[in-house]
Design a protein with these regions (language model features):
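Conserved C-terminal structural/oligomerization subdomain of aldehyde/semialdehyde dehydrogenase
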Residues: 24, 91-97, 278, 315, ...
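Residue-level signal for inorganic ion chemistry
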Residues: 92, 128, 150, 173, ...
Length: 539
């Protein structure tokens, strides 16, 4: 248990970090800290490391260098030193460095998790609830640090990073705590006890687009159900994962229960998926990468949970409020620079109202300010040069295949020569055979398709290899519900409903398998055991 005095020291040190604009804290590639204001550094050391010299401090800095992994409750050097530059997508400058792990680092983390599982799996619901409460308390202290890291690592505007990206982290923690308190782990049916037990060591592989959201919606239910774990965050956006790890360490997560190893997919990700002592792999990312995870996991017949790509339809029914529905649809696609797997990227409108819809979409897209994510812009950059090139190529492909360029288009926005910025783009008169209607673009690009009948709209919506999400807007509630019930997607949003963290999240078809969020997420981390004769009386 962390004492109140330690929490006070930590809060004071965090404030000192925020207030000091004179710190010189760039770490060199060996992980040693450069000189800075001594008092602030001493305070940071006292609160953040508990006297341990191997704790990587997080503070206001010109360069974030995170060169150690978190294994068995300690910050440790990689077995084979190797570093990677992390690029700020708004400036194209190096923002920091991380160490890249190896299969040997993964094995050390898995062995620590395996040892910890023996005791943590036997912890009580009350003990795990208390742990989640401590994590939530620590997260509140570090909320703004998390948000700032997300802005720097993947370009989310400050407001989005604070109010959505970082907020989702605490939302999933609170949801897991709520579910845990009432969750039924065992039930007697006749003389047979049906018991749900933690599955074991979990390998968690998370993406860069909603970094803490995806970490939290895996780690929180894993902790709540009594599992231990090894996390590999995206090497493209790793800063927020480091702060997340500091939060768990400060909250007193038992040694070995949570472990962090940075690295890339082909090395660290593959080692996690194929490790014989990992019992479950939970992966969020592209369908292509998900296939590799499943292939690596197959020889050990472990459980594989995946949340993959999407090409979500957004049906606007003939009796819908067209201005409201189109406006909401455009803004939803452009949110987070289009880098959301459940973005409603295929808007279906009645063909006779196509021109009206295009005019509304153009006005909304052109009203979105693009620019420095720390300056109040509505949309920041996409995450990397590779993503920028892919998005630009697909925009050009859409135009070549006959789509009408309604707004945006190829090239960077005017005045934004530095940074991976994309114009908010709307393509009209798209048909479902076009490349832009089939492939996940993962950028701020909306395709608008026309339909003649509601039956045709449903057929177009379902004509995709994906099935993560779908959206329907309509005026008559029962008719709108009937359309929603026929869409082949894991989550269907009716008339712009608010997010629900208790609602299961996951996909049909090539969008993955299994479910995250809320009570349904717990089942992914549990095995079911039947104990026959448990309730029988003695002969």
């Amino acid at each position: 248990m962390r004492t109140s005095a330690r929490r006070a020291r930590r809060e004071a040190a965090l404030q000192a970090r925020r207030d000091s604009d004179m710190l010189e804290t760039r770490a060199d590639h060996s992980g040693t800290q450069a000189r800075g204001r001594k008092a602030a550094q001493d305070a940071a050391s006292a609160e953040g490391s508990g006297g341990r010299p191997d704790h990587p401090q997080t503070r206001i800095q010109t360069m974030r260098d995170y060169l150690k992994f978190y294994i068995d409750g300690r910050w440790v050097e990689p077995i084979t030193p190797s570093t990677l530059e992390v690029i700020n997508p708004a400036t194209e400058a190096v923002a920091g460095h991380i160490s890249m792990g190896s299969a040997a680092d993964v094995d050390a983390a898995v062995q620590a998790a395996r040892r910890a599982f023996e005791s943590y799996s036997q912890s009580s619901v009350d003990e795990r609830a208390a742990l989640l409460e401590r994590i939530i308390a620590e997260y509140r202290i570090r909320h703004d640090d998390i948000a700032a890291a997300i802005t720097e690592e993947m370009g989310a505007p400050t407001a989005l990073a604070r109010k959505a990206q970082a907020a989702m982290g605490i939302g999933h923690l609170q949801t897991a705590l709520t579910v845990l308190k009432d969750y039924v782990f065992s039930e007697l049916r006749g003389t047979t006890l049906i018991r749900k037990e933690p599955i074991g060591v979990c390998g968690l592989i998370t993406p860069w687009n909603w970094p803490v959201n995806q970490i939290a919606c895996k780690v929180a239910p894993a902790l709540a159900t009594g599992c231990t774990m090894v996390l590999k965050p995206s090497e493209i956006a790793p800063f927020s994962a480091q702060i997340w790890t500091e939060i768990l360490d400060a909250a007193g997560v038992p040694a070995g229960v949570f472990n962090l190893v940075n690295g890339d997919g082909p090395t660290v990700g593959a080692a996690i998926a194929s490790h014989p002592q990992v019992d479950l792999v939970s992966f969020t990312g592209s369908t292509r990468a998900g296939i590799e995870v499943a292939r690596n996991a197959a020889p050990t017949v472990k459980r594989v949970h995946q949340e993959l790509g999407g090409k979500s339809p957004n049906i606007i029914l003939p009796d819908a409020d067209l201005p409201k529905a189109v406006t909401a649809g455009v803004r939803s696609v452009m949110n987070n620079s289009g880098q959301s797997c459940n973005a409603p990227t295929r808007m279906l409108v009645p063909r006779e109202r196509m021109q009206e819809a295009l005019a509304i979409a153009r006005e909304v897209a052109e009203s979105i300010t693009v620019g420095d994510p720390t300056s109040g812009a509505g949309m920041g950059p996409v995450v990397s040069a590779a993503q920028w090139k892919k998005i630009e190529a697909l925009i050009e492909k859409g135009i070549e295949e006959g789509a009408t360029l309604v707004a945006g288009g190829p090239g960077k926005p005017e005045g934004l020569d530095t940074g991976y910025y994309v114009k908010p783009t709307v393509l009209g008169d798209v048909n479902n055979a076009m490349t832009v209607a089939r492939e996940e673009i993962f950028g701020p690009v909306l395709c608008i398709l026309g339909y003649d009948t509601v039956e045709e709209a449903i057929a177009i919506a379902n004509d995709t290899p994906y099935g993560l999400a779908a959206y329907v807007s309509g005026g008559e509630p029962e008719a709108t519900r009937r359309v929603a019930s026929r869409l082949r997607a894991g989550q269907v949003n009716i008339n712009r409903a608010a997010p629900d963290l208790m609602a299961p999240f996951g996909g049909f078809k090539q969008s993955g398998n299994g479910r995250e969020w809320g009570e349904q997420a717990f089942g992914e981390f549990l095995e079911v055991k039947a104990m026959l004769g448990y309730g029988a009386t003695a002969d």
